[in-house]
From Swiss-Prot:
Cross-referenced Pfam families: Ribosomal_S20p
GO function term, MF aspect, one: structural constituent of ribosome
InterPro entries: Ribosomal_bS20, Ribosomal_bS20_sf
Gene: rpsT
Function: Binds directly to 16S ribosomal RNA.
Record region (Disordered): 1-27
Similarity field: Belongs to the bacterial ribosomal protein bS20 family.
Top-rank taxon, per record: Bacteria
Keyword Transcription: no
Protein name: Small ribosomal subunit protein bS20
Source organism of the structure: Vibrio vulnificus (strain YJ016)
Presence of keyword Ribosomal protein: yes
Biological processes, Gene Ontology terms: translation
Length: 86
């Protein structure tokens, strides 16, 4: 456990950041699941709409460092290919 003032402050900041990141990651996964569900249902319009929502979210998470930029690119590419195939 933190023994001095600065270490205690860093521990508090790290916990706040962890909770914030967990919330953002959960939100990202929720929108990704909505996109996957729309693709699985075969509804091209709903899938396109969900993809339009999830794309900037993935980009934002990559910019903020929650996910790697290649992971965001991979998800966007695969979603686009799956929607195109509908």
């Amino acid at each position: 456990m933190a023994n001095n003032k600065s270490a205690k402050k860093r521990a508090i900041q790290a916990e706040k950041r962890r909770q914030h990141n967990a919330s953002r990651r959960s939100m990202m996964r929720t929108y990704m699941k909505k996109t996957v569900a729309a693709i699985a249902a075969g509804d091209k319009e709903a899938a396109t709409a969900a993809f339009a929502v999830v794309t900037p979210i993935l980009d934002r998470m990559a910019t903020k460092g929650l996910i790697h930029k290649n992971k965001a690119a991979r998800h966007k590419s695969r979603f686009a290919a799956q929607i195109k195939a509908l």
